[in-house]
């Protein structure tokens, strides 16, 4: 694992917020310009980047410093990560990736799904009550004839 000092990061990498809300971990598979409030990690070959992403997400970072909070590279190194073999890293990432995707999709998709179900409920509720009202009117018409 290396600390990125380049202005533009082209490789797949992991960023961790180091100021304000510290410890927010992002996987980046696109080129970006890192802000000074990020610690950027471009893994060496012995690391599976998705394993590193999940391992970093599992750390409970402690706020240190001013009221804003900060995390320095030196402080970050104190947390340490147990790194299994590359094969085991890939196995762990293969298990955690689908779970992470499921929960991420759930958090993003659930509000939209709830809204669609509300619209569906409104539609069928209106349809059924209108149908009941029409049936009632037909019965009343038939009884008056």
Swiss-Prot record:
Pfam families the UniProt entry points to: Methylase_S
GO terms, molecular function: DNA binding
Gene3D superfamilies associated with the record: DNA methylase specificity domains
Database matches in SUPFAM superfamilies: DNA methylase specificity domain
Keywords for the protein's UniProt record, in alphabetical order: DNA-binding, Restriction system
One example of a Gene Ontology biological process annotation: DNA restriction-modification system
InterPro entries in the record: Restrct_endonuc_typeI_TRD, Restrct_endonuc_typeI_TRD_sf
Function description: The C-terminal section of a specificity (S) subunit of a type I methyltransferase (MTase); this subunit dictates DNA sequence specificity. The single R subunit has multiple frameshifts and is probably not expressed.
Stated family: Belongs to the type-I restriction system S methylase family.
Subunit text: The methyltransferase is composed of M and S polypeptides.
Domain notes: Contains two DNA recognition domains, each specifying recognition of one of the two defined components of the target sequence.
The name this protein goes by in its record: Putative type I specificity subunit S.MpnORF289P C-terminus
Annotated organism of origin: Mycoplasma pneumoniae (strain ATCC 29342 / M129 / Subtype 1) (Mycoplasmoides pneumoniae)
